[in-house]
Amino acid sequence: MGQGGVAPRGRLAAARGAWLVFEDEAGFSMTPSHARTWSQRGRTPVVRVRGRSRRRISIAAPTCYKPGHRSRLIYRPRRDGGNRDGRKSFSWRDYRDLLIAAHQQLGGPIVLIWDNLNVHKAAGLREFAESRDWLTILYLPSYAPDLNPVEGIWSLLRRGWLSNVAFSTPEHLIRTVRSGLRHIQYRSKPH
């Protein structure tokens, strides 16, 4: 750590006039998460669920920060249709496309900070990053979710919009996740 609790490389994004971008991914299933709620005394609230469902969605979301600019949240859902042999998560090409879209939306260089997921270190993605002068990739230490602000977004979603909800269809799950992310995306101040 540098002076004042800031890492020595903490000025990399500022020196390049770049956006500081944290990225993470999460999966959400049709099975509702439990949260505390209230009800009249003697009446326990019950959320009814129609059987088990393997259908789920994965979401990759970069959060983008730059002094003097409004922070941004960009997200891409990926639906898992429940196929046993189909890909359930993002491929390196999906991440490449997400980074290209983020670069176009932000209109400037990116210093990307993400975890050590094996797909993040794939040869194709590494070659892509090396061939782009607008992209610098740094990795978080292993098992350090507290250093990634996107983890807080997943926590807000799970504790808020997705808690105690029985999703009737995968589309209902996707609509609810998007609604929660939009609310977080355009929230002017923390509550």
Give the positions of each predicted feature.
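Short functional hotspots at interaction and active-site rims
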Residues: M1-H191
